[in-house]
Every structure is written in C-alpha cells, then in structure tokens.
Amino acid sequence: MSMSVNEKGICYLPDLGSSFTEDAPRPPVPGEEGDLVSSDGRQYNHSFYSSKSDSLKNEASIATPRRPDLDLGYEPEGSASPTPPYLKWAESLHSLLDDQDGIHLFRTFLKQEECADMLDFWFACSGFRKQEANDGNEKMLKLAKAIYKKYILDNNGIVSRQIKPATKSFIKDCVTKLHIDPAMFDQAQTEIQTMMEENTYPLFLKSDIYLEYTRTGGESPKLFSDQSSVSGNGKVLPGYLPTVIEDVEWRCDQEEEQIAESDPTPSNRLTQKLPLETVPQRVANSKRYQDNREYRHASWREPVNPYYVNSGYALAPATSANDSEQQSMSSDADTLSLTDSSVDGVPPYRYRKPHRREIHESAKVNGRVPLPHIPRTNRIPKDIHVEPEKFAAELISRLEGVLREREAQEKLEERLKRVRLEEEGDDADISTGPSLANHRVPPAVHVQHYGGRYSEMSYNGLQLRDAHEENPESILDEHVQRVMKTPGCQSPGTGRHSPKSRSPDGLPAGKIPGLMMPLSGGQGKHQARQGPKGEAAHLHHHKHIHHTHYAAAGKPKEQAEAEAARMHGGFAWNTEQHHYGPKSRNYADGMSVGPNTMDPMGYSSKGSTLSKRPVRKGEDGRNFEMREPLPADDMERNQKILQWMMEGEKEAGRYKRGPYGSISGPKKAQGHEPARPSSVERLGAVHPWVTAQLRNNVQPSHPFIQDPTMPPNPAPNPLTQLEEARRRLEEERRKSGTLQAKQRHKNMKKQPCENITVAYYFRGEPIPYRTSVKGRIVTLGQFKELLTKKGSYKYYFKKVSYEFDCGVVFEEVREDDAILPIFEEKIIGKVEKVD
C-alpha cells in the first residue's frame, strides 16, 4: 500500500501540536504549535521557519535532538532509529565478536594481516571452557592436545609469540601430566584478547575494510529484520536526520524526490562533504574496566562512529576536551542547549548532582583518549635517581673541598690574629725594655760598622712582619734550621736550649732573634717577640750589637772589641764564599750562613765555635787564613744547586708547617738561651741580597765596609749537600712509618670493642637470619641464645680451611664454651635438626 507524501509526513510527525518526536528538524516557534497541521492533514512547513529564515546562515544546520534517556524523565512519543550493528562494533571487542557479520569481517582483516590464528585460538579456548565435565576426560584431553599442538607448541606461530613463557609452561605441564582443567587455557586466552584489544582491534576500526563497510551501510540482516517498511517502495527510514542544505527550506516531499533521484545506495551513508550534519550529537566516551578489559558506556550516549575517528574529522583532542569539562565543572555552563526550556541549559536542582557526577566521569574518560603523545614542557631531571656509590663519591669530594676551604680560612684568621698580638706585644715590650744605651757596646765599633742613617735609627723603629710560606728565603731558612737540629750535628752547649720548640714559620718558639742573647757582666736579658723576617736594616742593627756582647762573654773588653771589628769588617759579600771551621761539614755552612761571613750573630754549625766560646790561641790564624776566590764555573754550579734545594724545600714546607704550635710569648722564653740560630738570626741580615745574588750573579751593594784583608771562604761540596738532603728524607720517612705503625696498633686495640655480624641458616631455609652481637668473641652458648626456636640441633660454622679444594668448610661445634670461627668478619652458621 502506497502512501502520499502528506500522509508520510503525518506519520513521520504524528501530532506536532501536542508533542515532538526526536526526528523533528527544527523546534516549533513558541505559540504556533497548534497551527502546524491543517484540517485536511496537509502540513505547512513554512510556519516552522517564517520567523527564523533570515538567521539560518548563522545557526547550526541541525537541531539538538531529544533522546529517550536524557534528563527529561520520560520517553517521547515515537521511537529512535535503531543503531546499526556495525556502529556497535566500535564499542568493544566483545561487541564485535558477538555479531556474526563482525566476526566474518574481523577474520577477513586478520587474514590480510596474517594473524587469523589469534581469533581462531580465542574461539577454541572459549569452546574448550564450555565443555561439560560429563563429556569425558578423554575427549577433553584430545581437544587440549590439539589446541596445544596447533597454536602453542610452534614457537614461530603468532599465538605462541604472544603468550608468555610461564603460561606456555603451565599449559605444557597440564597436558603432559594429564591434569585437564576447563580453565587451563584462560590465561592464554586473556593474553591473546589483550593483544587484540590493544593492537589488531584498533587497527581494524581504522582499516579500509571496516570504513568501506560503514560507507556502504552494511548488509547485516539484523538491520532489516527488526523493522518494517513504512513506505510502499520498501525504503528504510534513515537512522539520522536527513541532510539540510543551507539557505534552502526543508520540505517533507523533498525526501521522495531525493530518494528517486539517488542511486541504490542507502540514504544514511556517511558523506565527507557535510560530515557535521550526520555526526552523532552525543559521542560515547568509553571507559574500560581494568579487571576484565571490557568497555562501559554512559547510558545516555551513543558510540562514536569510527568513520569520523579516522577520516580527519575527529572531535577535539583530549586536552581540549579536558579543558572543556573542567570549565563545565567550575561553572554552571550551558551544556544542554535546550531551547524550549524556561531556563536555558540549567538542569533542575534534583538532577544537578547526577549531572555534575557525569561531567566528572566524562573528564576522567577524556584523559585517556588514545591520541598522539603531547610532550611535557617541564620534564623531570634525568639524574634524579643516581647510583648510591657515585653519589657518595661526589658528595665526599665536595665536602672535602668545603672542609679544606674552611681550614684555610681558619689558618688565615689565626695568622692575622697572631700578627696583631705580636704587634701589640712588641709595642709593650719595646716601650718597657732597656734602651740601647745600657748595652756595653764600644762607640768605635758602632760607628765603624754602621752608616749615618743606620746609627740614627732608634730601637722603637723596629718593624716585624709575619713570614709567608711561599717566600723562598723563609723556606731556605727553615730547611737549614732543620739540618742544624740534627742530633748528630749538635753544636757545643746544646743543653741550654729546647730543640723541639718550633714556630709555624720555622723559627724556634720563644726565641727572639737578636734580642734575647745573654749579656756580659751583670747585664739583664732583653725580651721581645719573635720577628720571622725583620727589615734588613733594622735587624742588622740589633743583631750586630747582641752578637758583639755574646761573643765577648767572659773576655776582656778590648779583646771582644777587636774580635768584633775583625769579624764584621771582614764580610766578603761574594757569591758562595764561606768559611769552614776545622770540623765544618754541616749543610748550613754550604748555604752561605757561616759565622764569619754572613751570620752577624756569630752562630755557626758544628765546627764554628767563635761565637760560643773564647777563641783559643792558634785557632785565630787557622780560621782566617787567606784563600783564593772561586772560578766563575764553580760559582754558577753552586748557585744552581742552591736554587734547586730552595725549590724542593718550598714544596716540602707547605705540608710540614701546620702541626707545630704558635709563637710563644715573652714569658716562655725567659731564662733560655738559644743554642741554635734561627733563620732570621742567620739570614735575616742578608735576605735583601741573597735573592739578588741568585738572580744576577753579581756582587750586591751593602752598607757594611768590606775589609780587603778578610780571606774568602771555600765553596761548598755539592756531594755533601746531596748526601745531607738524602739523610733528611730518610729520617722523615722513618718518622712517618713510626706514626703509621702507632695508628695501626691503636686501631687494632679498638677492634675488640666493635660489634660482629652473626648470620645463620635455620633448618635448610634459603634465606639466612642476620643479627649483631657486641664484641669479637662469640661462644656457642651465646649463639644458642639468639635462636628463637629451642630444641635439639646440630650447629655448623663456616671457616677457612685448605683441606679441600673449595678453601672453606662448615665445622660442627658442640661445646657451649667453644669460640665460634670468624669468616670474612662475620660468623656464618647452619642450624640443622637432629634426626
């Protein structure tokens, strides 16, 4: 029976005055609902658009349809078009496998990809699980063996490659041991299903086979069997609203003309020209359960059409969807757009909470949309997790650097503080000390050895400064002083000094150069702080005075004056010209510090006794015999040796100056006479010229008047200097070895107080028990107290033994007072049950 277009239109929109079907193309104009149908049943479509025809260009081409499961609470008259089966296939893999057409199409796709065995194996496992127990074990066993041989035994097959080794091993054991269980293939089936859901199933939805099937509308019989045709020509009602062309009014009779003019292709095919007109208004966002790998759909949404997923017209990406949902959650945004509501888009109060809950769920689902990865702008540092050993080594090195910096800063502050204290002490001592007028110095000697500007300098003009360890002169002085302190080369009168007292600058602590010498007669002793490197002119002045009185101790005044005049008048300021005494073989004599040449204090080494005792008769002539000057080659060689020794001492002085105490005060030095000259006492007066002598190889100018009759000193022997340096290095090595031995002995004494680790295996358990016991000696009785389970056991302990090839044995210990053996700083035992 054929129906007219008007009758079809009436059937299509039965009673527009009372209610509206979901397929209504436009909402009616308010107030004109009753004028939609005439008395003869003819529909006047112009009333739908009479008031809005001018605004169609700016409005969407389709209206928001009403679904029966929206928040309206009732189902409108009429029914929605059924969802085609091929669209349900996109919901989940189970939806695809529940349809015969879907299985056939999916198998075709898998054959093209050469992995159809995965689908066959999945169905084989499902059929095996559905086998009833009463079918007999023999039939189940044959079926299990067939599945195992065809799909799992072949390691090159697609199914065998996707199944985990543990699962294959389990199935093999079940088959070989004849333990047939209906669920023995469940794990393998789950793994294959996971593989299909993650790889082959998404590829199938994007494949040309499936997209072509959806474009042609499919040939599934289910689509036609559940609905009857309402038209005489057998055409099916479309599942979606027809396409509405812009700027043209839609009329019901247009559909018949379009159907007649179109090809046999169904009218609900998906076109790429106007995709937005046919896209589902509510796209289902699937949420997959993690336990059974199923999809759950919101009850009020339709599944997404795969055509639009892969055709370039996909919906907004996940980030955009999330932003939209967050905006909806943070405000009462219009998300429904129901134009016929009194309050546009705002749901009633009783539906607001469920609606908000659905929005939250939608936001969570959108966060897992499988779209291309968007790189993060703020990345976690790659080295946030470092190996503990590397981290500890780097941390220790940095902490050691910080510790060295702090120690250097503390030393610098201590040195500055010491200099300030010395300056304050010098001011006090100089102001209260006796004047130079009290010294018994002949005026003639004073005038003879000093110029006008030196004689005018007062005692208060003395400037003392701290010696710097990088200064070559101070390093050389320190080395010479250490050589002179050697026990085998003691000078006469060693009992009157403390040889171990030493300041950080290489000078004897409490010994003040040139200002603490014993005076002749009833004179007192001058006190002053130590000046490591005094100004040359000032130190010359005072040292000469004290030397004169010290050398003249116990002599008549005339004899002392004559000796002083002869000594200081005979300074020969030539390069490496020294005077050796009858027993002179000390390193200091080779370093230009002989008592008759460069040492105005009169101190010398072993063989030089002029400054420490009265000169015996006959010694004078022997000590002052004339010598020939050295040739230029010998002087140059001696200069190189001296410079080499100074550089070596510069490096050694950096590590050997710290452990000694600070400069002693004046009280500590009272009543002590130095038997060895300090560095300033020996070289303080010639520092300004020693460096120039090494650099320029010329005679420096000096304020002293040279005595042409003063004989030059012989050159030092280089072999003697090297032998002395070697002897000093060996002595330092012996001292360091003694300190290391003492440290090791001290550590060995501390070891018995440490704890020891005890580990034991209890009755064959693979994991040992570990504990710690105080002390290094543990007996079997103490070990038994550690056991939580009491009983009759045998005890074996690991020890080193070369009786067997392995090098270790487990020895049984029975006595409670027996000491347990220690193996690699641990006690390792085994506790076995007595049979």
UniProtKB/Swiss-Prot annotation:
Residues 92-214 form the RGS domain. Residues 351-436 are annotated as: Interaction with GSK3B. SMART domains: DAX, RGS. GO terms for biological process: cell development; determination of left/right symmetry; dorsal/ventral axis specification; dorsal/ventral pattern formation; embryonic eye morphogenesis; eye development; fin regeneration; forebrain anterior/posterior pattern specification. The keyword Cytoplasm applies. One of its GO terms (cellular component) is nucleus. Residues 16-60, 318-349, 485-530, 602-627 are annotated as: Disordered. The keyword Disulfide bond does not apply. Gene3D superfamilies: 1.10.196.10, 2.40.240.130, Regulator of G-protein Signalling 4, domain 2. Residues 437-512 are annotated as: Interaction with beta-catenin. Residues 616-627 have a biased composition (Basic and acidic residues). Keywords: ADP-ribosylation, Cell membrane, Cytoplasm, Developmental protein, Membrane, Nucleus, Phosphoprotein, Ubl conjugation, Wnt signaling pathway. GO terms for molecular function: beta-catenin binding; I-SMAD binding; identical protein binding; molecular adaptor activity; protein homodimerization activity; protein kinase binding; ubiquitin protein ligase binding. The DIX domain mediates interaction with dixdc1. Component of the beta-catenin destruction complex required for regulating ctnnb1 levels through phosphorylation and ubiquitination, and modulating Wnt-signaling. Controls dorsoventral patterning via two opposing effects: down-regulates ctnnb1 to inhibit the Wnt signaling pathway and ventralize embryos, but also dorsalizes embryos by activating a Wnt-independent JNK signaling pathway. This is Axin-1. It comes from Danio rerio (Zebrafish). The lineage of its organism: Eukaryota, Metazoa, Chordata, Craniata, Vertebrata. The gene is axin1.
